[in-house]
A protein has these predicted regions:
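Alpha-helical transmembrane segments of multi-pass membrane transport proteins
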Residues: 1-278
Length: 278
């Protein structure tokens, strides 16, 4: 869903339109969101974890009233507006917009909500470093790994092997999906897109697949890899933030990964899901 940075990287690697990719991602993104919301609702209804706590929070919110809640949250809601506004107006790049968002959030927390104090900033920075240091290490090693693969011409060999052994369109797309899922588990999104897009795109175009459709399929694949053990980066983020063991989170995430896979199959074999807004 816009402003999806991997779509921008895919556009850079293939020359496709960023705006068309953003449009193509809306319906698949909403479909995936709906599936995950359905599972979360079903899980909470069935297992009832923290039901009393959730109900108490809901009663508290209802007592406040919608407009009071909106008034309290308006400054926080402006943060994504500022980020998207900076990106789409050309005022800042996505990275620069993220920095602007950090300073805006810090200003709001210090002077409007007053939820933190100046003396707490250093501790917050230390906690942020503890959270993201393992992630940066993973990204660094995955970038080096992708460089080694490029030098060994592994992507070209994989492409040649796929073209040689699979001529059926359905089987070919399934194999490409499997390759992308495996890559997404061990490699960061950006190098994966930059390395594999120019190699796999001619293959899927050969069987009549739209490049925009393939871009959506690829990004969804890599998104699944981000939450798939053993190297799913988002698992490390969740583990660091919640102090819950990573494998425990991974176990709970497996049903959601299953819904992701269902969405991936629908996106792969029903092009209209991605292309209906173009």
């Amino acid at each position: 869903i816009p402003p999806c940075i991997p779509f921008i990287m895919y556009a850079m690697a293939t020359g496709e339109s960023v705006s068309e990719l953003f449009l193509a991602g809306i319906v698949p993104g909403m479909m995936i969101s709906a599936l995950l919301i359905f599972y979360a609702y079903y899980y909470c209804r069935r297992h009832g974890e923290d039901r009393e706590k959730i109900q108490a929070k809901m009663d508290q919110l209802k007592a406040k009233g919608f407009f009071n809640i909106l008034k309290e949250s308006i400054w926080a809601l402006l943060s994504p507006v500022i980020v998207l506004g900076c990106i789409y107006s050309g005022v800042a790049s996505p990275t620069e917009a993220a920095v602007i968002s950090v300073f805006y959030s810090l200003f709001v927390s210090l002077f409007i909500y007053r939820s933190i104090k100046v003396k707490q900033i250093w501790g917050i920075m230390v906690e942020a470093m503890k959270t993201y240091a393992p992630i940066l290490f993973i990204l660094a090693t995955s970038t080096a790994f992708s460089r080694v693969l490029t030098l060994m011409q592994v992507p070209q060999d994989v492409s040649a092997w796929i073209m040689t052994h699979f001529s059926n369109e359905i089987v070919l797309l399934i194999v490409i999906n499997v390759v992308l899922l495996i890559v997404g588990m061990v490699m960061d999104t950006t190098p994966a897109i930059l390395i594999l897009s120019p190699i796999l795109l001619p293959i899927v175009e050969h069987v009549g697949m739209n490049p925009i459709h393939f871009g959506v399929m690829m990004i969804v694949n890599l998104a699944v890899g981000f939450v798939t053990p053993p190297v799913g980066v988002n698992l490390f983020v969740a583990s660091s933030l919640t102090n819950v063991p990573m494998m425990q989170i991974a176990k709970k995430a497996m049903p959601m990964i299953g819904y992701f896979m269902l969405a991936l199959l629908l996106i792969t074999f029903i092009p209209a899901i991605s292309l209906c807004l173009l």
